Amino acid sequence: MKIACIGGGPAGLYFALLMKRANPEHDVTVIERNRPYDTFGWGVVFSDQTLGNLQAADPVTAGKILDAFNHWDDIEVNIRGHRIVSSGHGFCGIGRKHLLNILQARCEELGVKLVFETDVTNVEDHADADLVIASDGLNSRIRTRFESTYRPDIDTRDCRFVWLGTHKLFEAFTFAFEETEHGWMQAHAYRFDRETSTFIVEMPDRVWRAAGFETMSKEQAIAYCEKIFGRYLDGHSLMSNATHLRGSAQWIQFPRVVCESWVHYGGKDRRTPIVLMGDAAHTAHFSIGSG
């Protein structure tokens, strides 16, 4: 079976290695537009249940991921001077870059072909495959091209959020709510390696505008967030790794994506299934632990 995965994020890479592991005779290729070690974002989170699923699907990959994970059982909520802790939840964090590198290495070990720095502008060029996986992300070109088949419903939600990082190490899945003169602002933080935590700042759009984030530079916005959430940072600074974004562009409104169908049949005879996967098919909000 010839399989082409368009997009080398976690979904495309993991599907590729599982298919190759299931049958070494499969001809599996992953095509990614970025370089091997280019990635954006900070850490991602998996629940204990998800880790169990990974262990069942491919113990080798799961073992490498588990070695790199930072595990916690507590969720901590901070609001109006109160600290509330709930235990027994079981989550793990890992750096997105590290996760991708583990998946890339496992793909190569199994014989999956990895093609980088290649931008697929016409998915029909790969319609000679028996199966095409459209794992090309949230802003999937393939989903857009065959919109009439997939019939996506994209709902852009109200709140604005920004992905930041810090060297303050949080020992629990931490939610911090701060009531400001402009309204409520929230931080969502978790550790994902020995040195770094993800720190997401979120607020309603009206609060974001009232606080002036719309006209702030990236540096000004970070300084403002450090001031609001300083009590949780213990003197540590906040960091951005979105060097490709400027000013208010680093603030995102969550797009809830669902599709009526995940399969389009392409190629000359319309027999090649082009299947949406990952964020191209559906999105998951970071608050449920899918970083």
Functional labels for PLM-detected ranges:
Residues 1-72, 78-80, 88-98, 290:
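Glycine-rich FAD cofactor-binding loop and adjacent beta-loop-alpha segment at the N-terminus
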Residues 3, 28, 113, 130-132, ...:
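Hydrophobic "anchor" residues on beta-strands that sit immediately upstream
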Residues 5-21, 133-134, 250-291:
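Conserved mid-domain beta->alpha element of the FAD-binding
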Residues 24, 82, 108, 169, ...:
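Short strand-connecting beta-turns/loops that link adjacent beta-strands
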Residues 35, 139, 282:
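Short, glycine/acidic-enriched loop or turn micro-motifs at the edges of active sites
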Residues 48-163:
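Conserved N-terminal helical subregion
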Residues 128-254, 258, 263-266:
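Conserved FAD-binding catalytic core of PHBH/FMO-like flavoproteins
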